[in-house]
Amino acid sequence: MPPAPPDQKPCHLQPAPYRALSETILFGSLNEERWWHSTAPILSRLLISSNYDVDVQYKYLSLYRHLVLPALGPYPQRDPETGIIATQWRSGMVLTGLPIEFSNNVARALIRIGVDPVTADSGTAQDPFNTARPKGYLETAARLLPGVDLTRFYEFETELVITKEEEAVLQANPDLFKSPWKSQILTAMDLQKSGTVLVKAYFYPQPKSAVTGRSTEELLVNAIRKVDRESRFETQLANLERYMERRRRGLHVPVVTADKPPPTEADKTFDACSFFPHFLSTDLVEPGKSRVKFYASERHVNLKMVEDIWTFGGLRRDPDALKGLELLRHFWADIQMREGYYTMPRGFCELGKSSAGFEAPMMFHFHLDGSQSPFPDPQMYVCVFGMNSRKLVEGLTTFYRRLGWEDMASHYQGNFLANYPDEDFEKAAHLCAYVSFAYKDGGAYVTLYNHSFNPLGDVALAN
């Protein structure tokens, strides 16, 4: 049965829960206080516009204050010469390098908090790959939140995260890993309307690949099989492996031409095939109920490639897959998605840099859920960072109306604008980084991964 049209309510520039809590919070540091006022208003508006009960809004803002704020590390600084606003540690979660991102599953009107937990040592010689802090953050989350089980985290950490000895090798041999994207563990919390929280961990094994000489695909696939002792995921994983092998035999990176740039240092950490394994995520719940999502990226960004990946080269053609593909084509057209051959970015696009024209590959995740379906359900993520934010929101509004989501179509643009009162909406191209599309349970699912930070005071961007 298709999901009901999502809730969406208009929200105010200064949401009441944020204002009320701000009057009573004793912050642990100036960093925490500044992070709060730069990010919490956005989270509060998202919870209001998505129609969370008031008591649940206060619960999640309190959780944000006590768990997340201490994990965001030093507040960003503005370089007086360049005007660039950045943190010491550049997080691979966000193209601006910031360690926080709110995402909005508009189909279910659910909000997610993405966090790259850091300390003042992250990115320094003391902790060049930010290896230690994410574990401590998740262990704190497990003490605070019922139902969090870290078994899967510890298992994947052992397989995919560098050891102290491997870290020393990478430090002594900097040419082994020259990519600016160094995050190994990211985290997320799905904020359910009921007040329960689903915690997830994401593992990026590129540093491990560089120091061991094993490919990203080998590390990811072997890790999944090692933790999947009951072979719940085997059929779906084997079909995904066969598709990746078919792609390796066929579509390789084309000869470089004027419009196909050479590989960046980040590109060199991945497979040369345009479709390359990237990372995985897992639910931090009881292992028998935990799902795994396998993420891969695609440098050829066009509808023909989307259709090939969506159908596993034409093998996945059940009615839901074909209906989803039909809607995906409308989605692509409505947002006027750009097409081309896009390498991994050379570096981050920190605040203060021009984001117009910034490009990156698209991504897909493949949902290994242990169901009877022989193919894992795909979800597409297109990078819209660098595209005009106003035109993107207008395109999304068109798509919402196509789906019959009238509440969302009526209020989405106004609510989006309220989060960025100091931005020039006509020129901004960084307010949304990715948009994802999936089709399940007879309906479309769209999630927005939005800019989640407004700088304060002397750090604010000059007009």
UniProtKB/Swiss-Prot annotation:
Site residues by UniProt (Required for regioselectivity): 114
Annotated pathway: Mycotoxin biosynthesis
Annotated GO biological process: alkaloid metabolic process
Keyword line: Alkaloid metabolism, Prenyltransferase, Transferase
Catalytic activity: brevianamide F + dimethylallyl diphosphate = tryprostatin B + diphosphate
Function statement: Brevianamide F prenyltransferase; part of the gene cluster that mediates the biosynthesis of fumitremorgins, indole alkaloids that carry not only intriguing chemical structures, but also interesting biological and pharmacological activities. The biosynthesis of fumitremorgin-type alkaloids begins by condensation of the two amino acids L-tryptophan and L-proline to brevianamide F, catalyzed by the non-ribosomal peptide synthetase ftmPS/ftmA.
Assigned protein family: Belongs to the tryptophan dimethylallyltransferase family.
Name of the protein described by the UniProt record: Tryprostatin B synthase
Gene source species: Neosartorya fischeri (strain ATCC 1020 / DSM 3700 / CBS 544.65 / FGSC A1164 / JCM 1740 / NRRL 181 / WB 181) (Aspergillus fischerianus)
Gene name, Swiss-Prot/TrEMBL: ftmPT1
